[in-house]
Swiss-Prot record:
This is Recombination-associated protein RdgC. InterPro entries: RdgC (IPR007476). GO terms for molecular function: double-stranded DNA binding. HAMAP family: RdgC. GO terms for biological process: DNA recombination; regulation of DNA recombination. Keywords: Cytoplasm, DNA recombination.
Length: 301
């Protein structure tokens, strides 16, 4: 259940989530209809075993999951059938259908194919820290994150969540760290980075499995390149890649964090899940608070 990517948003800590269990059932995921392309709504964080449980809260952490059902209708299939229809009409009437007629034919084909199309299911998990006013979405896609915000907004009626905003340029901070400026306590460099020439269309350099403080990196910095992605390690607990878009990718929970699970005395699947949720939430909070200070992240109040 550990998140692998984090797209973060801020929201006011004054928001009231006390009625969330009442508000979610009306916006629960409904099966995609025969003539619908997709459906979105909340599902149980625990999967099919507890379908009626649409949220999970432990202290100040709230776990929500947005589910989706999407019809798979390959464009190549539609276009192939459309060309056959067009060819039949051309042979029968001696002329090719107009653009408007082709569009109508295509719409009719989609309408005909939708009820027979395969359905792909998906889920996107999110953790809300109600004390510090941020939401961490398990996705590296800003669009996926915004979709989750939209679903929460639909449930609450209002949800003024905003993407993270740094009061200092993230590139400048990341470049400074790789150039030798002191990192926040507990943070160290990993072995991966991406550097770009600031001019439009400039060179891009990607380094992996490499010592990031050395002559080769220094030459790129001297040439004016700026760091846009940087691998970092938080103590022995987390490793991740931080981008200048403030998205956290390749998040991995290390032994320093996972060892805490071995000391848990609770038994049972739910107890184990709660232990993992508690651990993950606490580590993400620690990371967020560190980045909040280092990057001067704006609040949403």
């Amino acid at each position: 259940m550990f998140f692998r990517n984090l797209t973060l948003f801020r929201f006011p800590t004054t928001l009231d989530f006390s009625q969330i269990d009442t508000l979610l059932p009306p916006v629960q995921l409904k099966p995609v209809g025969p003539l619908e392309m997709s459906s979105r709504g909340f599902i149980s964080p625990f999967g099919r075993d507890e379908q009626g449980v649409l949220s999970h809260r432990l202290e100040d952490f709230l776990w929500l999951t947005v589910g989706g059902e999407d019809k798979i209708l390959p464009g190549a299939v539609v276009n192939d059938l459309l060309e056959r229809k067009v060819a039949e009409i051309e042979e029968k009437e001696g002329r090719r259908p107009s653009g408007k007629a082709r569009k109508r034919l295509k719409d009719d084909l989609i309408h005909e194919l939708l009820p027979r199309a395969f359905v792909k299911s998906s889920r996107t998990d999110a953790i809300l820290d109600l004390q510090h006013g941020y939401i961490a979405v398990n996705s590296s896609s800003r669009k996926s994150g915004e979709n989750v915000m939209s679903e929460i907004r639909g449930a609450l009626g209002s949800f003024p969540a905003l993407p993270l905003n740094a009061e200092v340029a993230p590139r400048a901070i990341l470049t400074g760290w790789i150039a030798g400026e002191p990192l926040p306590e507990g943070l160290s460099l990993g072995e991966e980075c991406e550097m770009k020439d600031p001019i439009e269309g400039g060179a891009v350099v990607k380094c992996q499995h490499q010592e990031l403080r050395g002559d080769e990196i220094d030459k790129h910095l001297e040439a004016g390149k700026q760091v846009t992605k940087l691998a970092l390690v938080l103590d022995d607990n987390l490793s991740f890649v931080l981008g200048d878009d403030l998205v956290i990718r390749k998040l991995k929970f290390l032994d320093g964090a996972l060892d805490q699970l071995e000391h848990s005395e609770d038994d049972g699947a739910r107890a184990e899940l709660d232990a993992r949720f508690t651990l993950m939430s606490a580590e993400i909070r620690r990371l967020f608070l560190l980045l909040e200070t280092a990057l001067k992240l704006s609040k949403a109040e």
